[in-house]
């Protein structure tokens, strides 16, 4: 199994840099190593242990056929989250969180279907029969839907888990997941409340290098879970054939 986490790699990526001590959340105390120049330093041995713990759970979730929805709308996280989530074929939200994304999933699915129906209109020629004004309106709607929901177009049911970068910023996503008992995995910085999260990864959630490093471990574990599922399906098919 992969994911041998080197403390030096975490250090080089700046995963240990927390926030100013005056901005801290006291509930993060167990994960703080020390204070240096008015900044809290995260205990990377605890980070490594928490990554392993989270990865073990993530492998099981994806091996059972469920999706992990990645959520990160802050500037320094958007691109890396989109890239990493896409690499393991998982849905992600990097634009504004659509209110009711989880708690009103049926409505969100309708919006995604609207996107598909516009694409169908373009394929079957219906689009060409519309007036110039109607075409423009539909194109604008399609662009808006694509921007906000394009990355979750293949998510036909609620996710098995959420992976969040910065729980303070994504507090609405956190609340919706809690309401539906969907497990929350998150990078939690020293200014955030770890009590809201099922699988806490104490880490610098402001630097893109730190975010990329944590996500590389997480997506590697997801890949392993997917590979395990593929080989299980293959074995099942072989057994069925033999019978």
Language model features: what each stretch is:
Residues 212-237:
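A charged, well-structured terminal subsegment
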Residues 74-77, 97-102, 168-170, 190-194, ...:
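Conserved nucleotide-binding/hydrolysis micro-motifs of P-loop NTPases
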Residues 119-161:
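Active-site rim loops that border cofactor/substrate pockets in soluble metabolic enzymes
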Residues 68-69, 91-94, 183-187, 222:
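Short hydrophobic alpha-helical runs that function as membrane-insertion/retention elements
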Residues 14, 70, 162, 214:
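Residue-level signature of catalytic and energy-coupling elements of molecular machines
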Residues 168-201:
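Nucleotide-binding motor/catalytic cores of P-loop/tubulin-like NTPases across gene-expression machines
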Residues 1-67, 73-74, 78-121, 132-135, ...:
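N-terminal cationic and glycine-rich segments that engage phosphates or anionic surfaces
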Residues 46, 197-208:
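Short beta-strand elements at the ligand-binding edges of bilobed clamshell
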């Amino acid at each position: 199994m992969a994911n041998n986490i080197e403390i030096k790699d975490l250090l080089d990526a700046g995963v240990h840099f927390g926030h100013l001590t005056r901005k801290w959340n006291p509930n993060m105390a167990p994960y703080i190593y020390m204070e240096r120049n008015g900044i809290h330093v995260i205990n990377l041995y605890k980070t490594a242990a928490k990554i392993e713990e989270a990865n073990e759970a993530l492998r099981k979730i994806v091996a059972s056929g469920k999706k992990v929805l990645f959520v990160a709308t802050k500037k320094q996280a958007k691109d890396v989250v989109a890239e990493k989530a896409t690499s393991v074929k998982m849905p992600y939200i990097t634009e504004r969180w659509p209110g009711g994304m989880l708690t009103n999933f049926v409505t969100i699915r309708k919006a995604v279907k609207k996107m598909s129906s516009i694409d169908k209109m373009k394929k079957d020629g219906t689009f060409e029969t519309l007036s110039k004004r109607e075409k423009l309106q539909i194109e604008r709607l399609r662009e808006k839907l694509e921007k906000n929901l394009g990355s979750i177009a293949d998510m036909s049911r609620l996710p098995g888990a959420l992976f969040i970068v910065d729980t303070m910023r994504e507090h609405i996503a956190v609340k919706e997941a809690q309401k539906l008992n969907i497990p929350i995995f998150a990078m939690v910085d020293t200014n955030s409340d770890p009590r809201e999260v099922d699988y806490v990864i104490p880490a610098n959630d402001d630097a893109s290098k730190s975010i990329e490093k944590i996500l590389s471990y997480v997506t590697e574990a997801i890949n392993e879970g997917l590979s395990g599922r593929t080989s299980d399906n293959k074995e099942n098919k072989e057994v069925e054939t033999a019978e």
